[in-house]
Amino acid sequence: MSKNSLEERLAELEMRLAFQDELINTLSDQVAKQEMDIRELWDAKKMLHKQLKDISPSNIRREEEETPPPHY
């Protein structure tokens, strides 16, 4: 192989490495943002679940409030 060919291959590999580094950083930032979004959505879901429980009490009575079945 000629010296010029090796230099071209090395330059190509360096460009690919730089591109991959940039891509990894971009993907890492995106994953971090999505993790924050998921946490926010999870917190909102918990809050909505609590609000729903507070405004619509269950129609199911607790066991001690239930009358025993007729066969007892």
Swiss-Prot record:
Stretches the record annotates as Disordered: 53-72
Membrane-crossing residue ranges in chain numbering: none
Gene3D superfamilies: 1.20.5.300
Organism of provenance: Marinobacter nauticus (strain ATCC 700491 / DSM 11845 / VT8)
Coiled coil: none
Pfam family membership, one: SlyX
The protein's name: Protein SlyX homolog
PANTHER family the record matches: PROTEIN SLYX
Similarity annotation: Belongs to the SlyX family.
